[in-house]
Amino acid sequence: MTTIWSAFFTAIGKAAFKKNVKVTKVTLGKNVKTIGAKAFYGCKKLRTVVIKNTQMTGKTVGSGAFTGTYAKMTVKVPSKKLKSYKTILLKRGVSKKAVIKK
């Protein structure tokens, strides 16, 4: 498993992909409303995350969801949500070295 495309999911469960070193790219579709705590914890090879949803908040992204992922990963977010998503993602474990862009 290298790519996860979640067009039909509404949530990524708690610790769903924890320590899965085969995951390299994740695309979170518009339907994904929540990301559980430690959902991608320890996914050291996760290099790209694409977020298409515009409704995520600090309450809908669980603690440590991205802790232990590749430090210099690229995260693509909707342009109108760049600032707020950057704050949320950094609080939820995305490294400060990561590139978060629209």
Region spans (language model):
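Structural signature of tandem-repeat unit edges
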Residues: 1-11, 18-34, 44-59, 70-84, ...
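Consensus positions within tandem repeat domains that build extended binding/scaffold surfaces
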Residues: 13-16, 36-41, 63-65
